[in-house]
UniProtKB/Swiss-Prot annotation:
Keywords associated with the record: Actin-binding, Coiled coil, Cytoplasm, Cytoskeleton, Developmental protein, Differentiation, Neurogenesis, Phosphoprotein, Synapse, Synaptosome
Protein name: Neurabin-1
Compositional bias ranges of the Low complexity kind: 182-195
GO-annotated molecular function: actin filament binding
Gene assigned in the entry: PPP1R9A
Location(s), subcellular: Cytoplasm, Cytoskeleton; Synapse, Synaptosome
Family matches, as InterPro entries: Neurabin-1/2_PDZ, Neurabin-like, PDZ, PDZ_sf, SAM, SAM/pointed_sf
Name of one Pfam family that matches: PDZ
Modified residues (Phosphoserine): 192, 338, 371, 460, 840, 915, 928, 956-957, 960, 974
Free-text function comment from the UniProt entry: Binds to actin filaments (F-actin) and shows cross-linking activity. Binds along the sides of the F-actin. May be involved in neurite formation. Inhibits protein phosphatase 1-alpha activity.
Record region (Disordered): 1-66, 87-117, 147-213, 251-395, 627-647, 839-865, 888-952, 1051-1098
Domain SAM: from-to ranges: 988-1051
Length: 1098
């Protein structure tokens, strides 16, 4: 079995084309040649030739040549001749309706027999000169064989000059002919659907040759296509009838059991019978596989047979000169057998004699079995040759690229990768395959109780046969050794592609096609082996490829629209190119600069050969010079079959019948009457084709003349229409210019109007916004005014209630004082009570609440009625630190010595606080007021810090009472200080101005202001000089007064403006009310007048 590469070893250029399966089968056939180089290998080669390949490819003699080439690297020269002779003697099935000739003679296109220039023995001798050793390049050897076979191209069994021109350097199918030399009628057949409508004579021409060649093609193709190989890993289920048929050939293993060659059908009819009889038998009995149902196999075989029936007759004819059956039957007719042919047969007999001895030794261990069609295909050979053919043959079967291998009591030898057990079992050639013994039965489908009436199928309930399968693990797939085959075929092709410079090209396919013609280059062209690839042969002038400029002659076409063209047949490549549409994507490979391109040399030789053939055609068909052009290449050689307007009748007809290259081949000595009549018939058909085409061209010319006259009339009519349209266009253009100017002016007016409108809109929006703001402010002001009015009224009411309450309390306090004086009667107690009352009143004047005042009053009453010891807590409560802190904050660290005239400030000043503090100290030192004398108090008051206190203590009780009353009145006005400020400043009195100064902590200037009788109106007129005159020397005090005066002036101004606005609004409201009243009065007057008039009328 062939060793395969791992996926990691494959390059990105390895195509996933289905051809790999075909290559794999070919490699297996070649590998068996290496494993059994003598007998087994050669017989497997025989079977490999007949196996059906994918896409219509079949093994040809080139496969044998390549295998022989590989074998010669490790053989002796004397072995080379024998092997080549042996391989030369093998071929496909014969064509019964063709005249058979010896190997020295070759049938020409016209049916004449021409002697080969170089005989078979000469070719055999050429291989003796080949180099030995595996280091020599097999490609170089095949290249030399190809170059030598180019000179033998005139000895083809059937060819056309045009075809030879297109593929002269293609791989040679046989020893004397190339692959491109077949397929003339194939081209016509493929084009028959198109040519029927255009030129009926071409169809008739195609039918003539189909009638001549198709019977042999069908019979031979069926004979070849029914020969299969089973080479996979899955079991093959053959019916017992087939096994019996196979067993009947067991006696053929013995060379003595073969009948003599003269009994095997010498003439053509017997060969036809012997060939045709076993074919349907094998086709119907040997194709059931266990993994595939019988109906599927039959369906897969029928397309193969149908396709094989449609194969070109030329593809079969190429094997004709080398088929052994054809040779043995043609020998009686050829009266001049050459000595080279005799040498070939002797060499074959010697080789077969040695291999027959080997076979007899192998028969002890058993051998392979053979197919009936293989025995039928071996007709006409010598007895040892035929027995050798059956020595190591296999039965092969192909179905959709799936390969199966028959496993029985023996295994075929699959080369170095096989196991030792397989090699031992391969020697068992007498054992027969009995597949019925390798399956087990299981219970089938159960019987159905209710079968639907509409069912058209029936299920079998018979037991199900289960065949044993063998997994891939049974085979050794290690790649420990690399044999020579691993470096051939597809691997070599893709390796060659890797060395090319690849680039993508996209062409747009037009009505004339892609503008390129292709050619397949290589040695094994028919089987795909050692094929160089598909190359660009010519580039059509003016075509899509020439306009693009990237595709050049000798470039290799690697891919077309994602389909790989590496290692495919030329027929397949032409089909792919023909089926492309629209934008076609190519991957082109080109030789890198500096490399010697063998393809370029081959293509140049092909073009040169075409040139010579074209000259030959011109000589023989001088009357058709006008029709002989390059537009009608075949579908198998180039892609220009896509050209729609090509006349296939003329060009194709000429290309179908092509004459040989050399003039000496047409010597009258070698031409008989039948050949001349055949040639005359060809010329008649060509003449008929040409006449039909000429007649068709005449009719086309007449139609063109009529069309020309019609076009002239239309031209004059169109010119008149053009003139009229020009005049109308001029008028319309003038109208259009006028309309354009009018639109211009209208646009200008519109722009001006729009600008004015925008300006007015802006002004309107601004005015609207101002009106809304003003209305909102007016509403806010009215609301604020109402709120202020309500607040002032509430404050006045609260002050009034408070004043009344204070007056009531004053009266109560006076009554209490008189009561206390009557009780105590001493001056000291009076003075103490006076001090207490003054401090309590001072607290009231500084914002104490009514509750604190009541508390002080009750504490004073309790202190007078209780014992002296209980009076101490009262003095502690009077000497609170909160009072001291409040006094300090009110003064704000700006304490000044009071003047003696300021008697009013003696109690509220800091000195008064100090005196109170000393009095508290005296109380804390437990000095009782009763023991304190008036002299002590006077001495205490005589201290320099308390001048005001000493004066106040010296006063009489009546004077102190009057002072208390004055202080109560003054302090009662102090809560109303803010209320005084709220009044109009111009209305302030001198006392209110004094209070204002006291609120600013400027008590020292109160006496000057009161002395000068400064009222509110005068206060607003004061400036810096006047303030200095009033004794305000401190600049800070002046700045405070100026600031306050400025604020008052600003507030007065605002109030004045607000008053004016309010008066205006009131005036407006009054006017509105008056207007409404007037309107109402008018309405009432009208109503009264109307009622009066109505009453008067009544």
């Amino acid at each position: 079995m062939l060793k395969t590469e791992s996926s990691g070893e494959r390059t990105t250029l390895r195509s996933a084309s289905p051809h790999r399966n075909a290559y794999r089968t070919e490699f297996q056939a070649l590998k068996s040649t290496f494993d059994k180089p003598k007998s087994d290998g050669e017989q497997k080669t025989k079977e490999g030739e007949g196996s059906q390949q994918s896409r219509g490819r079949k093994y040809g003699s080139n496969v044998n040549r390549i295998k022989n080439l590989f074998m010669q690297m490790g053989m002796e020269p004397n072995e080379n001749a024998a092997v080549i002779a042996k391989t030369r003697g093998k071929g496909g099935h014969s064509s019964p309706q063709r005249r058979m000739k010896p190997k020295e003679f070759l049938e020409k296109t016209d049916g004449s027999v021409v002697k080969l220039e170089s005989s078979v023995s000469e070719r055999i001798s050429r291989f003796d000169t080949m180099y030995d050793g595996p280091s020599y390049s097999k490609f170089t050897e095949t290249r030399k064989m190809f170059e030598r076979s180019v000179h033998e191209s005139g000895q083809n069994n059937r060819y056309s000059p045009k075809k030879e021109k297109a593929g002269g350097s293609e791989p040679q199918d046989e020893w004397g002919g190339s692959k491109s030399n077949r397929g003339s009628t194939d081209s016509l057949d493929s084009l028959s659907s198109r040519t029927e409508a255009v030129s009926p004579t071409v169809s008739q021409l195609s039918a003539v040759f189909e009638n001549t060649d198709s019977p042999s093609a069908i019979i031979s193709e069926k004979a070849e296509n029914n020969e299969y190989s089973v080479t996979g890993h899955y079991p093959l289920n053959l019916p017992s009838v087939t096994v019996t048929n196979l067993d009947t050939f067991g006696h053929l293993k013995d060379s003595n059991s073969w009948p003599p060659s003269n009994k095997r059908g010498v003439d053509t009819e017997d060969a036809h019978k012997s060939n045709a009889t076993p074919v349907p038998e094998v086709a119907s009995k040997s194709t059931s596989l266990a993994s595939i149902p019988g109906e599927e196999i039959q369906q897969s075989k029928e397309p193969e047979d149908s396709t094989s029936n449609q194969q070109t007759p030329d593809s079969i004819d190429k094997d004709g000169p080398e088929e052994p059956c054809a040779e043995s039957k043609a020998m009686p007719k050829s009266e001049i057998p050459s000595p080279q042919s005799q040498l070939l047969e002797d060499a074959e007999a010697n080789l077969v004699g040695r291999e027959a001895a080997k076979q007899q030794r192998k028969e002890l261990a058993g051998g392979d079995f053979t197919s009936p069609d293989a025995s039928a295909s071996s007709c006409g050979k010598e007895v040892p040759e035929d027995s050798n053919n059956f020595d190591g043959s296999h039965v092969y079967m192909h179905s959709d690229y799936n390969v199966y291998r028959v496993r029985s009591r023996y295994n075929s030898d699959w080369g170095e990768t096989g196991t030792e057990q397989d090699e031992e079992e391969d020697s068992d050639e007498n054992s027969y395959y009995q597949p019925d013994m390798e399956y087990s039965e299981i219970v089938g489908l159960p019987e159905e109780e209710e079968i639907p009436a509409n069912r058209k199928i029936k299920f079998s309930s018979a037991p199900i046969k289960v065949f044993n399968t063998y997994s891939n693990e049974d085979y050794d797939r290690r790649n420990d050794e690399v044999d020579p085959v691993a470096a051939s075929a597809e691997y070599e092709l893709e390796k060659r592609v890797e060395k090319l410079e690849l680039f993508p090209v996209e062409l747009e396919k037009d009505e004339d096609g892609l503008g390129i013609s292709i050619i397949g280059m290589g040695v094994g062209a028919d089987a795909g082996l050692e094929k160089l690839g598909i190359f660009v042969k010519t580039v059509t002038e003016g075509g899509a490829a020439q306009r693009d400029g990237r595709i050049q002659v000798n470039d290799q076409i690697v891919e077309v629209d994602g389909i790989s063209l590496v290692g495919v047949t030329q027929n397949f490549a032409a089909t792919v190119l023909r089926n492309t549409k629209g934008n076609v994507r190519f991957v082109i490979g080109r030789e890198k600069p500096g490399q010697v391109s063998e393809v370029a040399q081959l293509i140049s030789q092909t073009l040169e050969q075409e040139r010579r053939q074209r000259e030959l055609l011109e000589q023989h068909y001088a009357q058709y010079d006008a029709d002989d052009d390059e537009t009608g290449e075949y579908a198998t050689d180039e892609e220009e079959d896509e050209v729609g307007p090509v006349l296939p009748g003329s060009d194709m007809a000429i290309e179908v019948f092509e004459l040989p290259e050399n003039e000496d081949m047409f010597s009258p000595s070698e031409l008989d009457t039948s050949k001349l009549s055949h040639k005359f018939k060809e010329l008649q058909i060509k003449h008929a084709v040409t006449e039909a085409e000429i007649q068709k061209l005449k009719t086309k010319l007449q139609a063109a003349e009529n069309e020309k006259v019609r076009w002239e009339l239309e031209k004059t009519q169109l010119q008149q229409n053009i003139e009229e349209n020009k005049e109308r266009m001029l008028k319309l253009e003038s109208y259009w210019i006028e309309a354009q100017t009018l639109c211009h002016t209208v646009n200008e007016h519109l722009k001006e109007t729009q600008s004015q409108y925008q300006a007015l809109e802006k002004k309107y929006n601004k005015a609207k916004k101002l009106i809304k703001d003003f209305q909102q402010k007016e509403l806010d002001f009215i609301k604020r005014q109402e709120a202020e009015r309500k607040k002032i009224e509430d404050l006045e009411k609260a002050h009034l209630v408070e004043v009344q309450g204070l007056q009531v309390r004053i009266r109560d306090l006076e009554a209490e004082v008189f009561r206390l004086l009557k009780q105590n009667g001493t001056q000291v107690n009076n003075n103490n009570n006076i001090f207490e009352r003054r401090t309590s009143l001072g607290e009231v004047s500084k914002g104490d609440t009514m509750e604190n005042l009541d508390g002080k009053q009750t504490s004073c009453q309790d202190g007078l009625s209780q014992d002296l010891n209980e009076a101490v807590p009262e003095t502690e409560r009077l000497d609170s630190k909160a009072l001291k802190t409040r006094a300090q904050l009110s003064v704000k660290n700006r304490r000044q010595r009071p003047s003696r005239t300021r008697l009013y400030d003696s109690v509220s000043s800091t000195d008064g606080e100090d005196s109170l503090e000393r009095k508290n100290f005296t109380f804390n030192d437990d000095f009782s007021p009763s023991s304190t004398s008036s002299a002590d108090l006077s001495g205490l008051g005589a201290e320099p810090k308390t001048p005001g206190l000493s004066q106040s203590l010296a006063l009489s009780s009546d004077e102190s009472l009057d002072m208390i009353d004055d202080e109560i009145l003054d302090d009662g006005q102090s809560p109303k200080h803010s209320q005084c400020q709220n009044r109009a400043v111009q209305e302030w009195s001198v006392q209110q101005v004094s209070h204002w100064l006291m609120s600013l902590n400027l008590e020292q200037y109160v006496s000057e202001f009161s002395a000068q009788n400064i009222t509110g109106e005068q206060l607003l007129q004061l400036d810096g000089n006047k303030l200095k005159a009033l004794g305000m020397t401190a600049s800070q005090d002046r700045a405070v007064v100026k600031k306050k005066l400025k604020e008052m002036k600003m507030s007065l101004e605002k109030a004045r403006k607000a008053q004016e606005k309010m008066e205006k609004q009131r005036e407006k409201l009054r006017r509105k009310e008056q207007e409404q009243m007037q309107r109402k009065s008018k309405k009432t007057e009208k109503m009264t007048s109307t009622t009066a008039e109505g009453a008067g009328e009544q």
